[in-house]
Amino acid sequence: TDTRRSNRSRLLQSIITRGPATRAELSRRLGLSRPTVSVIVNELLGVGVITEGDRVSSGGAPGTLLEISKRTGVIVVADLRSADIVRLSTISASGELVTTDEAPASGTDQVQSAVTAFIDRCEPQSVIGVVLCVAGLVTRGEWDGEGERDGRALALGLRRALRLPVFAVNAAEATAVADLRDSPGDVAMATVLLDHQVAMALILDGRLLSGVTRRTGDIAHIVAGTPGPVCDECGHMCLQQQLLALRTDPATATLLDAAHALAAVLAPIAAGVELTEVVLSGFPDAVADELAGLTHRSLRTRMLDEHVPAVRVSKRGPSAAMIGAAALMLYRLLG
């Protein structure tokens, strides 16, 4: 039935994005009865999609962890956020980084050659899909491209050459999915990602929100009203310029201005969608923790105390986007 398919999909999504769990934990996460969870689990065990792992106890009767089968294979992630380099990784079904490499590649053909050569050096028979991790808008797994890279031609060329599924995902959204493993169960989370630009992704009630004509978290050029450098692109002292300045000038005044700007942009979003957590990813290690604390304090001056979300630094490191991208691809293949 549709309900059973939906519950199966939700259960797989939970294991893929939030990590291994016992039957009891899955019942709590999904709000499903124990018998319903057991029926779905037995079906997935029977077809080899999931396997039973270690027995764990959280104070009650021990339970057995359920995880995605290691026999599922690996996913190749091509990080295309740099205009002239492609960073490549293989990620296991359990979300572990297996191998990494990078190659100079600016145009479509160069990227395709780099990806196919990387797969040839790995174990090609173990690869179950390729995901393109990009900074731009992704619509139903397709990316138009940017600069010298034609996203649709690249995906089509890789599908033909490799005979594998190839999809694109937005890097901020992928990072948010990776960060979800470290968040509480009932979470409304915003991940703010700083790399070549500023982007945000939203996860509400376990669901990733995606934009229609632009990225959901397109907050880069919002003007917060705090002093900062003028942006060449929009001509204003926008949030993106204030946060990018932290990479070259981590002075206290710059950090405080950045925190106030970030809080000014996040406060109405937090109030509007009941955010419980903000995660900062990609910020310089030297300032990330202090920025999180200052942003939280600034939010408290703009909102009711009971509405202020927690602000923390991502624990996933520079590989977060790749790990999250692989999780999104795996869910697309199995869910």
Identify the residue ranges that each predicted region occupies.
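Short, ordered coil/turn segments that flank beta-strands lining enzyme active or ligand-binding pockets
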Residues: 71, 93-94, 139, 196, ...
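Short secondary-structure boundary segments
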Residues: 134, 194-196, 277, 282-283
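Short, acidic Gly/Pro/Ser/Thr-rich loop/turn segments
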Residues: 83-85, 137-139, 198-199
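Glycine-rich phosphate-binding loop and adjoining helix at the ATP-binding site
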Residues: 97, 102-188, 233-234, 289-301
